Amino acid sequence: IEKLRLRTTASLLSGRKDIIVISSVSCLYGMADPTAFASKVTHIFRGMKIDRDALLRCFVDAFYVNNKVEFKSGCFRVNGDTVDLFPAIETFDGVAYRIEFWGNEIDRISSFDPLSGREIDEQEELNVYPTNLFVTSKERMAEAIGQIDVDLGKQVEYFKEIGKPYEAKRLYERVVFDLEMIRELGHCSGIENYSRYFDGRNAGERPYCLLDYFPKDFLLVIDESHVTVPQIRAMYGGDRSRKQNLVEYGFRLPAALDNRPLTFEEFESLTPQAIYVSATPADYELIKSEGVVVDQLIRPTGLL
């Protein structure tokens, strides 16, 4: 699912107007700030003047890993003036790219099969997207780590005051380990639970989601709306209940509560144009449509 979301965001950031995204209600869950994600996209082209090591630093900042032993999605490898890259969004197509340098200039870009090494074709340009949806700048990361550290101290002290030493110990060990991973690798398992710090959001402020990546004039189509709309309404409450337990028992900081799906009101504010498709529309759809209803007769399969 993560790879599909990466590919979707890459398509939306391409600027094309003919993109169709098919998604479940999970599209309302938190993602990175679109501006921060776009800032980590590296555009390269044949004839581009750039130092090889500078390009490799761009890849590392986008969470690519230098791996000569196991060349897989999200990795790159270096052999002299040649850099092989396996973009994260190409996982399903199985296409990797070879970037050849002549001094400090990109001389050639080609795609190839990472299993056989067979060249597929030449490329004039290439966009390299991050391997992770939660990206941020080094400055923002340093600030976020400081804020996480402060909140950890407050929450540990709170647990000790109310007589929960085991919860305090569990939380301390978990968050300290996560911070070490973030400092070393730039990310950790469950980093989305710290997204509020990396996005610079205040407590309670809505997270960014897939809908923020769409242009302002996008059209939303909700299929089986009599079922989907109630699901959207219930998502926030269900997620909140589960996360509250994680916080109370010391598995997560309170900031994890802000890694959440949108409330129904927030969802409505992001979807100015919508078509509700249903054989049995509820009162909500009928009221929202203000009487603008189109009937469609669908032939039952096998009867005619």
Predicted regions and their residues:
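ASCE RecA-like P-loop NTPase motor cores
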Residues: I1-L304
